[in-house]
Amino acid sequence: MEQFGGPSGFMPPASYTAPLGKYPTKQPSAAYPSDGGRHATKENPRPAEGQASRQSSSVPSAMASKPIQDPEGHSAQPTSSYCRAQTPRSTPLPVALDEEARLSQYEVIRQIGAGRFGEVFIIRHKATKALLCWKLVFYKGLREKEKKQLVSEVNVMRELRHANIVRYHDRIVCRSRQCLYIVMEYCDAGDLAKQIEAAHKHHGGIDQDRIVLVVVQLIHALAYCHEGVGQERRRVLHRDLKPCNIFLASHPEYPDDSSRCIAKLGDFGLSRHLNMHSMAHSCVGTPYYWSPELLEDGQKTYNVKSDMWALGCVIYEMCTGKTPFAQAQTMPQLKERVRCGPVLPVPGFSDSLNALMASLLQPNPNNRPSALQCLGYTIFRGCSYTPPPLYRSSSAPSWTPRNASPARGSPSSAVSTVSTVTTSPGSSSRTSFSAPSSHDAAASSPASASASSRYQHQRSSSYSSDSAGPSGASAPSQKAPGPGRPPETPSRESFDLASKARPGFFAEAPPPHAFAEASPPESHASEFLPPANGAANEARNERTQRDRTRRAASATAAAAVSAFERQQREGRSMSPDPSAPLASIEEEEEGEGDDAGCGSLGSGSGVTRRMPGASLNREDRREAPGLRHADTHKRDDRDGAIWTGRREEAPFSRPGSELARDFGAASQNKVDTSRFSGASSGKPRPGNPQNEDRASFASDTSARQTVYLSGLSRRCSEPPAAFHSAVSPWDPAPPRLSSAASSSSSSRAVSPSSLRRASSREMKYPTDDRPAVAAGSSGVALARAERGPEPGAPWGNEETEGLHVHGRPSAAPASSFSSERTSRPGHPDEARESEHCFQGRGRFAEAEASPATEGKDPRDSGFEERSGRRDEGRTDGGEAQSFGYWPNGRSDEARDRLGAPSVSPFSSKRITRRSSTAAGLSTYASPSDPAPSARAPAEWRRGAAGSSTVSAAGACGRFLPSPRSWQGNEKSFPSSSDHPSAYPALPHPAAPAYPEPGAQASNQFPRRRQSAFPSVKRLDYEEEHASSACLPTLLSPRFPHHPVSRPAGGVSPRSSQRQALAPTLAGMTFERRLSAGPLSSAPFSAPQERTTRLVGHRHALAADAERAEAPFSHAFRPGHHDRTPVGARRVPPRAETPGVSLDPGFRTGGPLDRGPVGSGGLEGQSFDFAHPTHASSEKKEAETEWSNPTAPVFYSPRSPRNDLPPGDGARSPYSAHLRPGVSEACSSFSVPPTERYEDDKNSHHAGSGGAFSPPTFGSPTPGPVPVGNERTFGRNPSPAATCASFSAKTGLRTPAPNGLAGDSGAFRSTNSLQRTPMSRRVSAPFGAGSAEGATAFGSRYASSGSFSKKFPQGSSSGVHEGGGAFGRRQEGDVSRVDAHGSVSPRSFSFLQRSDAPLSRGQPEGSHFQKHGETRASPDFARKGDSTQTHASGGRDFSQSGPFETQDFTFGEQPTRETRHMAPSPRGIERGGPQGSFVGHDTSFSVYAPRAGHAEGVESGCSAFEAPSESLSRRDGEADRENTVPNANGQMPVSGMPASKQTYGDDCDLYDNSAWTAQKHAPENFHAAVAPYPSSLLTGFAEGQQKAASRSSCLGGDR
């Protein structure tokens, strides 16, 4: 009867029109009822007052006849505005009625369908007016097999009692007519097949949220059947699961809302009981839903996994509108297609849903998950559905029918009250329903009933779980007036089971829908009929149902463990997937007190900071006005000896997600609890959803030394032995006290969804290497929990989170704690990834040990919290926000309110910055580093990358916060001003343009770069670690040593041997900088800032030197194109010593007053050129950088991964940066260096040993104005050894919303992006002379093309309180790692400010254009090379528009390089037009050579590459070239038609409309590069099938 709806098929009512609306992403708190029903209508009236139901039948009621279950504390049914048909419930008559009398109890309404065995009718129970349906089957003409099948259906249905299974009520055998009446529940919303057809025909498909809701109900029903039903605990196989056998019933609370239907499994005519280990041996059901074991000729045995296969087919049909194998017309075709499997993933749906379908449609039934295992999948973790028990107990509160008038004794005001606890605006809310007792009915009012029963509904991109606050206490529920009982709380046992079955809820909060039992009121007991098996069986079945629910919940975790053990038996690897896209940048800023400042345990303070939310995806932008947040404080001053705890809730207030955590610290034998939890929003990924860690701070003699671990960790970490000591994770443990034994713990976790394994290990040492003052007075506890994605899975939204808590409590000497939480939300739609990191660190100082705390509270402590965000496109840096805080005895509330400055009771000791590069190659050092020189010391060439500098600054009077802690319209922070101010205010328009001499700078914005702790007696220690994006390397803070990469001797990132190589340790560099200029009061007249900077050098081998920079300011002068930059200055060195050079610094800056109308954009450019101090045997690096302040973001010019041309899968929004420089590593300075500076023209300078031809800086004005601000630089320290290298980078990064979106994510089709010719070559020679097997890797590439697209600027902007000023601030940092022990600067900052009080909508813009000339560089030619031509082409950079959008137009001529190189693993090769070219060169070391992907060009492009050797070392020795062909056996070529070139002074863009390129990536693409890291190539593999049928290229048309 599958062609009809209803329980056995029926047609939907004529009034039903719109099938599937969009599912709400958050389900109502009211659970799905065990039975469904409709409103009382004229056709379905209610019984009159006093009308007694007939007690002459044992037939149960209709679908809607039983009230919904009442949860403990969360009533499942708000009866405020809903009156359902009353279920007849009473004891049966002692005298049985005959068949005619039983049939006369029902009134036949109409026929709704017909099937193989009979007809289906809607009927009404005359006594209760409840709508039911019966299947009328004439068994006279049935064969014996069909009769057995009919009896089987009745026998199966009578034992099934589940909210998501069509309810069986009674059977009536009419022997006079030789027919059987099967009375069952009536599902009024039709079957799923018709809903799918109508949705895909008229509405474009079904929303994923609704699919998830239907599927989770079906899984609950199948889990109920497969785990065994009845007294004999026999499993039930449906054997005919398909959409037309899945029926939909109206929700009892929302009968007119088709989007909230309840899915019910029906038509068990082909079902069969199955013993625990038996098999069924018949092929029944629809062939399109048959599993592979059913289609095999010789194998027709199957078990419950066949139903799971059919469920996967149903999910696929809901997503696509057709069965997975609908193309098959014959049985052999069907077998072949089933053998090949369906086409997955289904586009437009999340990875989690596709993963569920892929696991259900596994050909091997042993690999398919069971129904219980499916409940652990990530896609269901936010789904709030839980099936309720079917029956109520007599102990539950009574209920009053809805809409009964007060005169009838059923006041309409007798409603359940809705209590909603909302964490924050826009965040997920918890709705609980408390059912009033019969005494409350009379006291309630209809108005309150209507208001309180409103459904709390919100929409977002996915489901999210409701959770209580971190403390586990929920807000009190609202209760109806009167002496009604409060809502009951579920037991701990029931919650523990529920949390196991549905991970995602916190262990201290009840599940959102914990169902209890309730019974109907005794006054209406006469209106109800009992089930067929009587009251005794009903109670027994009720207990059985609860027991089954507990067993099913516990089986979820057991299933995961079983899968884990099976996976372990199969010998699968426990190590992380090396190709997983784990590339990340982590910046950690740690503030630690001096040892002398340690004191007794004191009180702490908490400052709640806003967690910066990631960008909204498209759906969020459409449905949510923006991100909101709510911050709360909770102080707990328990006594003077215990540190004050705090509670922080920092929710992502995007609809449907929240994060909360508790922080606290205590003295010895006290417990510090740290917990965080998250509900994912967007596209979830596999991974455990929550962690809870409890670390006990106990004395040394205590036995509690356990580390609690939970969650799925894809990292194997070995923390340092002592957290605050600079010890490598891989160095031996420091000496420990003999009385304290070390302990270690390991944990392994498995994701129930992915069945992938991972492990983590934590080493814990009870004491550090410092002796304790007294026995038992010192202890340490370490707790770490990480929740991460499974290895190899793509990034999802807000998925990865980790928590690291470390404490060292003590009663007397010193106590400290630290915590770090990192979350990495990814944005697949935008091919970006962000990272949020919160760190807390404190030390409790003694009053007498620290002069800064004199007269202060001895319990003063410090806390610093940092949050950062990283975009994947800017792989070498990121944005960060930090907020540091040291109280001086005043209360938190007063300080926060006044924003008063405070003095740190201890000194900031160090800053540690760790960075993992995202180049995608297994490297010793950053891709920006040159290859090691043969003359370099062995320690350098060993690859122990990372260098350190130590600098000291004079004592400042006050603590200054990091500039990254500021954002518009944020909370106040301690400033350097003597006057407290809640917000930094803009100056009055009448304020002077320049501050008067001696004027106090107040209300200023902090404008510091780089340093986050300009505090008292600052001593900064900087250390940078480089890491591979893919494989464990020597310097990765996250991974242990790789057996191949670990050198002999155990060189560590913090090795003293490495630090001894830094000559600058012999001296110090100090810098003091004050930004005291007021902001401008008008866009075009007032100066922007004023800066005074004093920089000094103190070197052991040289005289002290100081230089001061004059105040610098610039203003806008619109309409004048011939202005030259102002504010330039050059400061000579103060002293020089033979053998040590203190190079001069040069800095120039000023406005770029261009544009025909003077848009008023805040512009400027800056050229910084400064050499660090150096001595012999020291590598020196000098770099000049140009940054356009109007470019909102930045990227490192030294990383080939970042230098992607426009349209080349750009991963960051947009940026522009130019940074040429010179890198040297020489043994001695036997000959004075040769340096030249020239301005205002293009020139080429060569010293005696080398020639350098950097790109030139363009003129700030177009046209015939001479080029200004050019810098060319040549340096030859030693004529005997050519050991200098040059690198220069230019580029503009633009996003491709519709284009190929990044090299570690899925590639996307290009819609309107113009084609961008590009030529790039990467050479990977074998490193014969390199140490430790590292090979040199040279890269030369350039780009050309055009791109014009509007997109959001992505800056933080806001209106300051108290005024209409509109400002914006952007800042970024880039870290560069040096493998040669360089002491040159390794990072730079980029800052854009537009703080002028412009009105909303005020446009701003800038324009930059550079010109150059062609010149040959014969000194760069090597053996086998033909000439190389390097030249700079034209470049246009412009932006205009309102604050929210920016327009960019970019054009650059390509590069022609006559070098034969291996394929590029970073992008698709392109051809470009002939003409002037510009070339770029960089080199870095790698573990092994790596072949790239296959690339080519269309016909019409001529190849011009000639075989040659590639040099990546500058010591005169050539490495062997790696000429490994690509996967297609081809060498990449690029060319261009001679006619495609257009040049002009205005740098017109050439016509590239006829250009295209082909991506040739064979199916064995991954196999071709299997030995090498492939995170950069994952996007090609994922997009292979999509790209097979179209011409796909970076920037090309689809």
From Swiss-Prot:
Residue positions of the active site: 240
Assigned EC number: 2.7.11.1
One Pfam family from the record: Pkinase
SMART domains (alphabetical): S_TKc
Gene ablation phenotype (knockout): Conditional knockdown results in severe growth defects. Defects in centrosome outer core separation. No significant effects on the centrosome inner core splitting.
Reported regulation of activity: Phosphorylation status of the T-loop (amino acids 267-293) modulates kinase activity and subcellular localization of the protein.
Keyword vocabulary terms for this entry: ATP-binding, Cell cycle, Cell division, Cytoplasm, Cytoskeleton, Kinase, Nucleotide-binding, Serine/threonine-protein kinase, Transferase
Any one GO molecular-function label of the UniProt entry: ATP binding
Entry superkingdom: Eukaryota
Function, as annotated: Probable serine/threonine-protein kinase. Involved in controlling centrosome splitting. Promotes separation of the centrosome outer cores.
Family under the similarity heading: Belongs to the protein kinase superfamily. NEK Ser/Thr protein kinase family. NIMA subfamily.
PANTHER family: CAMK FAMILY PROTEIN KINASE, SERINE_THREONINE-PROTEIN KINASE NEK1
Protein name as it appears in the record: Serine/threonine-protein kinase Nek1
Organism: Toxoplasma gondii (strain ATCC 50611 / Me49)
